[in-house]
Amino acid sequence: MQTAARRSFDYDMPLIQTPTSACQIRQAWAKVADTPDHETAGRLKDEIKVLLKRKNAVLVAHYYVDPLIQDLALETGGCVGDSLEMARFGAEHEAGTLVVAGVRFMGESAKILCPEKTVLMPDLEAECSLDLGCPEEAFSAFCDQHPDRTVAVYANTSAAVKARADWVVTSSVALEIVSYLKSRGEKLIWGPDRHLGDYIRRETGADMLLWQGSCIVHNEFKGQELAALKAEHPDAVVLVHPESPQSVIELGDVVGSTSKLLKAAVSRPEKKFIVATDLGILHEMQKQAPDKEFIAAPTAGNGGSCKSCAFCPWMAMNSLGGIKHALTGGRNEILLDRKLGEAAKLPLQRMLDFAAGLKRGDVFNGMGPA
């Protein structure tokens, strides 16, 4: 067994995952609708507002979706947040129908936590490269090879993979949960994001076996180009999501979830920020800190057709038209087998309970509830 100090590109598992193919990515981009003109967008938003009230529905959106959808969610009493905030909001809201604007695992998580609610999505084909790269059968076989290890999986996974896990985590609470498990002497299997897993392993010193998944957006950030950009803007604060490669994370002044990066952008006194995450977050950053400058971190070097192409094609598949379509006749509903949902809820609820304890400021054994 190699130690936590080993080089970040040495991982513990053979390449047995199903990688996200260029064909899948092209297919996703092909389904992205054109941005509607101002008049059409206004009409669609008005129609959706009526439908949300009529259906006793609430719109729950991720920071990475179209700004039009983010604004609509807030205008109608919904939520814009990271995956942890979305899950918590959906579980606590009284609406009988949740419209989840994000990627499929987010809709599944909402259904797992609220099986009695109707969960709709603008497009059921809005996937996630981490989910696609971690098929349940292969991941379960990997876990079976290490029965003495606690299985912790990122929220960016299918309901079937969650059901195989002991813990589900998001980037908002991953360090705290792994620190807690380490304090209990537990050894871990981590999946699917190898960069986030390696970052957590280096930060906590936990004994972790890593699955080799990655996010197609964050995996493209380039450390060398980011260093050059940072040299051009020495007064800028570098904000990095931990799904990025180690060479990028090491340049970060703040490393964390989308919510943590947003909070840093708003609360820190500096006026310039380089942002290494999906560019969808820039909308909320600019809204909350209009006096500050935000620079997209580079995803390509010299000769690249796009210096920063940090957009998730599946997030981009969410559209106002898709939301209207979902609400008209209840289309695009997330359906889960009852037993599968119950099994997946245990590790997911464990994370939410843990996060609630952190928020309350409970006394912890190590970093988690005793």
UniProtKB/Swiss-Prot annotation:
SUPFAM superfamilies: NadA-like. PANTHER family: QUINOLINATE SYNTHASE, CHLOROPLASTIC, QUINOLINATE SYNTHETASE A. Its cofactor is [4Fe-4S] cluster. Catalyzes the condensation of iminoaspartate with dihydroxyacetone phosphate to form quinolinate. The keyword Transferase applies. It is found in: Cytoplasm. The gene is nadA. Iminosuccinate binds at residues 62, 83, 154-156, 171, 241-243, 258. GO terms for biological process: 'de novo' NAD biosynthetic process from L-aspartate. Pathway: Cofactor biosynthesis; NAD(+) biosynthesis; quinolinate from iminoaspartate: step 1/1. It comes from Neisseria gonorrhoeae (strain ATCC 700825 / FA 1090). GO terms for cellular component: cytosol. It is an enzyme of class 2 (transferase). Its main location: cytoplasm. Binds 1 [4Fe-4S] cluster per subunit. Keywords: 4Fe-4S, Cytoplasm, Iron, Iron-sulfur, Metal-binding, Pyridine nucleotide biosynthesis, Transferase. This is Quinolinate synthase.
